[in-house]
From Swiss-Prot:
GO terms for biological process: tyrosyl-tRNA aminoacylation. SUPFAM superfamilies: Alpha-L RNA-binding motif, Nucleotidylyl transferase. This is Tyrosine--tRNA ligase. Keywords: Aminoacyl-tRNA synthetase, ATP-binding, Cytoplasm, Ligase, Nucleotide-binding, Protein biosynthesis, RNA-binding. Homodimer.
Length: 428
């Protein structure tokens, strides 16, 4: 069940969900929220052609504020993306070309759009790009109007920068050092243009956010606020949002809806109820009831399926969720008749291990090439023991050669050894 957060105690509700790492002048912010709707913003730098799971918590926070009646501004950093944020980064970022960054800006703007409502009256969301105010600014204006308000002493003492300065092998370029000024000016600019009074971001952005608060006060004599969401960690200490294949992306072309769904299904019991608070709009009482039910049911917990459904629907829509569940069910029961060509394309993208083979190959060779078996001899024994299926149908003849009828949609054959070991053959 989705809920609309009451604006008057919104900060408290976010804290109950574990979504507040730090907040400036919490009492004054709570008072301001109680007075009526505000405008707030969160920035997304185009450092890749897609957002990833690390962006999801602040993005959903924007949505939570909008549901409570506030006006969200999604800022895509067309200018800051050309510079690179040094915050807590061990080394200098590679600079991307203007054309590349512009292409990524367009993709990220489209990605952000479905999460917010851009047509709901007074609190309709706004999409902004900081290249609009930095693109035409000359260096003298930057140094005189922005630079003069920043103390280098304070800047080098910010934790995010200090870590780089203290390393013998990695310093920091003036380019990245100036990033703090750019993000600070974003806040001041959005305050003037749209009346923005709150910036939200990840906990690594605290130094940049407080710089923006100070600059807005100096330039416009306005009180503004900052709130950071926590860095998501897993109970076992490993990094959240990563798989063996790398980051989990929001773009379905980079991480398929099936793979995305499976990522959440595989959430550890120690993390799942916390993640339901972070990544869904379920009421806290409902999450607690689910935890109690799982604890007492004596069966496998239901929470992972609820989490996977909720987040996959949020990111990939009903169609993406239905496809992910259909593929999951088909792989589990071995019946592939319900799978569409698009479903096989998801599997080929990142769903199961995939190999390419020339037509006319035999089953033993396919098992070896796919690394489902180490040798033809072992493959022969496995096939004879009835442990291999082709598209869900058992095949016990070690001398079997693939037939045209084994090739689905003119391209695909799904092999399985045992219950869980899959490989998708893509025929050349």
């Amino acid at each position: 069940m989705e809920i609309l957060m009451a604006s008057s105690n919104l900060i408290k509700q976010l804290q109950e969900r574990g979504l507040v790492a730090q907040v400036t002048d919490e009492e004054a912010l709570a008072e301001r929220l109680a007075q009526g709707p505000i405008a707030l913003y969160c920035g997304f730098d185009p450092t890749a052609d897609s957002l990833h799971l690390g962006h999801l918590v602040p993005l959903l926070c924007l949505k939570r504020f909008q549901q409570a009646g506030h006006k969200p501004v999604a800022l895509v950093g067309g200018a800051t993306g050309l510079i690179g944020d040094p915050s807590f980064k061990a080394a200098e970022r590679k600079l991307n070309t203007e054309d590349t960054v512009q292409e990524w800006v367009d993709k990220i703007r489209k990605q952000v759009a479905p999460f917010l409502d851009f047509d709901c009256g007074d609190n309709s969301a706004i999409a902004a790009n900081n290249y609009d105010w930095f693109g035409g600014m000359n260096v003298l204006t930057f140094l005189r109007d922005i630079g003069k308000h920043f103390s280098v002493n304070q800047m080098i003492n910010k934790e995010a920068v200090k870590q780089r300065l203290n390393r013998d092998d990695q310093g920091i370029s003036f380019t990245e050092f100036s990033y703090n000024l750019l993000q600070g000016y974003d806040f001041a600019c959005l305050n003037k243009l749209h009346g923005v009074t709150l910036q939200i971001g990840g906990s690594d952005q605290w130094g940049n956010i407080t710089s923006g608060i100070d600059l807005t006060r100096r330039l416009h004599q306005n009180q503004v606020f900052g709130l950071t969401v926590p860095l998501i960690t897993k109970a076992d200490g490993t990094k959240f949002g990563k798989t063996e294949g790398g980051a989990v992306w929001l773009d379905p072309k980079k991480t398929s809806p099936y793979k995305f769904y499976q990522f959440w299904i595989n959430t550890a019991d120690a993390d799942v109820y916390r993640f339901l608070k972070f990544f869904t709009f379920m009421d806290i009482a409902e999450i607690n009831a689910l935890e109690e039910e799982d604890k007492n049911s004596g069966k496998a917990p239901r929470a992972q399926y609820v989490l996977a459904e909720q987040v996959t629907r949020l990111v990939h829509g009903e169609e993406g969720l239905v496809a992910a569940k259909r593929i999951t069910e088909s792989l589990f029961n071995g019946n592939l008749s319900d799978l569409s060509e698009a479903d096989f394309e998801q599997l080929a993208q990142d769903g199961v291990p995939m190999i390419e083979m020339e037509k006319g190959a035999d089953l033993m060779q396919a098992l070896v090439d796919s690394e489902l078996q180490p040798s033809r001899g072992q493959a022969r024994k496995t096939i004879a023991s009835n442990a291999v299926t082709i598209n869900g149908e058992k095949q016990s003849d070690p001398e079997y050669f693939f037939q045209d009828s084994d090739i689905l949609f003119g391209r695909y054959t799904l092999l399985r050894r045992g219950k869980k070991n899959y490989c998708l053959i893509c025929w050349k």
